[in-house]
Amino acid sequence: MDPSAESIAGVDEVGRGCWFGPVFAGAVVLTEVAAVELLAEGLTDSKALTVRRRARLVPLIEDAATAWALGQASAREIDALGIRSATELSMLRALQRLPTPLELVLVDGVLPLRLWMGPQRTVVRGDSKCAAIAAASVLAKQARDGLIKRLASRFYGYGLERHVGYGTAIHRRALLDLGPTALHRRSFLTKLFAVHGSLT
């Protein structure tokens, strides 16, 4: 028997390629009715949404979802485990925080979630095909970007409020001028500093 929508979670990550800060994951359970309503409101992959549209969707998702949760893995965990394992850890943490028993997890992408012991299915481009995955993407993106922007005043000079940790030219120049912070992913910066100087 196929699992009901109320027991299916969509999970997605954001910030995988960033140089700074944690990788985030969202996990969302939606009824079929909630999925249709959110899609009608413009729900899609968070990367395709403007900041304003994404912010408008967040409370709609939180209200419509049967359950939702977030997880993260720190820059230190990324350096210790590698980005794939750390990303999976953030997804597992999000899924474990859901109060709803799950019969199936839909994972965005082509790689299965190795740490998840229950049934799962990968969905290529799931954040543009599956409402629950798209909703997870939006919640995770909004939460991560909000955190990084709040940290911008603490780590002044890196332009975090503009690039939220991604590897832009502004970020690269700041790293070369100021060096990495405690929240930078050192494993991501090896090539940059191999060319331009030591990683201190």
Curated annotation (Swiss-Prot):
Catalytic activity reported: Endonucleolytic cleavage to 5'-phosphomonoester
- Matching CDD domains: RNase_HII_bacteria_HII_like
Q: Which residue range or ranges hold the RNase H type-2 domain? A: 6-200
Q: Name the GO terms of the biological process aspect.
A: DNA replication, removal of RNA primer; mismatch repair
Q: Which InterPro entries does the UniProt entry name for this protein?
A: RNase_HII (IPR022898), RNase_HII/HIII (IPR001352), RNase_HII/HIII_dom (IPR024567), RNaseH-like_sf (IPR012337), RNaseH_sf (IPR036397)
UniProt GO molecular function: manganese ion binding; RNA binding; RNA-DNA hybrid ribonuclease activity
- What Pfam families does UniProt report for this protein, alphabetically? RNase_HII (PF01351)
Top-level taxon of the source organism:
Bacteria
Needed cofactors, names only, are: Mn(2+); Mg(2+)
Sites binding a divalent metal cation sit at 12-13, 108
Q: Which family does it belong to?
A: Belongs to the RNase HII family.
What PANTHER family does the record tag this protein with? RIBONUCLEASE H2 SUBUNIT A, RIBONUCLEASE HII
Q: Which named protein is this?
A: Ribonuclease HII
Q: What organism is listed for this UniProt entry?
A: Prochlorococcus marinus (strain MIT 9303)
Q: What gene is this protein translated from?
A: rnhB
